[in-house]
Amino acid sequence: MKYLRLFIVLLIVLTGCCASKSGNKNSIHTFKINSTGELKEFFSYSSDRIPFICAHRGGSRETFPENCIATFENTLSKVHAMIEVDPRYTKDSVIVLMHDPILDRTTSGTGRVSDYTYEELKALRLKDTEGNITGHRIPTLDEALEWAKGKTILVLDRKDVPIADRIKKIEEHNAVTNAIVIAYSTD
């Protein structure tokens, strides 16, 4: 019974959060974090906060492809969320956002991401969750890090980009207050 009450309270809180901004389509929910101390405090446990939401691959849905900046905007227009992204290397060592190592499922292209240069990938378009080709292109990690400033926290998964390279990108963009990395081991 205790868990049922907690679930109902959380559902009401989350429904209120989602509904609070729905009237203004230009408004997005943002996290304003200005220092690493504030980021640490943000992730510290507090019993009076609503649960964290992390939008896997950015919160893709029909007409909104995964790992796409327009999708991130759409997600934040509905709810406060961190955005999980999937960095991958191109043939010319540009880091783009792409979950799969193969382009076929999520883009108008075929083959391996790592077999294309970034210039070649720019000609491709992303597919939505229904497999429809959209007008959206594959973003770079650089673009996502710049976009996220003052809006949200990017959660950088590993894929084929080592932790040191992800951290280097975060530092290059002065994004230490709005990006974190996923590590699958301490090695």
Q: Which residues are covered by each model-predicted region?
A:
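Bacterial Sec-dependent N-terminal signal peptides
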Residues: 1-27
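Phosphate-group recognition and catalysis centered on beta-loop-alpha active-site segments
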Residues: 17-187
